[in-house]
Amino acid sequence: MNIAFLPVRCGSKSIPFKNIKSFCGKPLLYWSVKALQESNSIDEIFIGTDCNEIKDVVKDFNFSKVKIFNRSKENARDTSSTESVILEFINKMNFNSLDVFFLVQATSPLVRSIDFDKAYAQYKKEAYDSLLTCVRTKRFFWQD
C-alpha cells in the first residue's frame, strides 16, 4: 500500500492557521491533498493534526482516500520535529514492510498528481530505498 502523510498544525507562530488560509480560492492544504487524491500511485492519505479546525476543513474536501490521524499535543508544538510526528504515526499504525510512505508538505500547493506518479515510478524502477524531491534554485534568475 502507498501511504501519504501530511503533518499539519494550527499553531504556526508566524502565520496562524496558515495551512487552511485561502490560496487561489481554496485552503492552502487543499492543493497538496487534491494532487494526492488524483494520483494513481497513492492509496491512502493521512492528515496528521491535533487541530479541530483543520479536521473540519479536511472533512469538507470529501476526498475518498483521506483519513485523519490524531497527532498528540506533544508532537504538535512549535518545537516538535517532523520526524517525531512521523515516528508517532508509524508506531501507532499497522503498516507492513512493503508499504511505501510519502511525506508531503501541505505548503507545496504547486505539486501535481503526476509529480507523485513520476516519483513513484522512478522509485520502483530504480529499486531505491528512498527518494527525495527538491528544486534547484538560483540566487539570480539571469545566471546559469
Predicted feature locations:
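N-terminal nucleotide-binding beta1-loop-alpha1 segment
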Residues: 1-16
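Conserved core of the sugar-phosphate nucleotidyltransferase
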Residues: 78-85, 100, 108-144
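Residues at the starts of beta-strands that form the adenosine-phosphate
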Residues: 1, 43-45, 99, 129
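Conserved N-terminal catalytic core of the sugar/cofactor nucleotidyltransferase
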Residues: 31-97
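Short acidic donor-binding/metal-coordinating loop in glycosyltransferase active sites
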Residues: 73, 106-108
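Short, well-formed alpha-helical segments that are part of the catalytic scaffolds
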Residues: 15-38
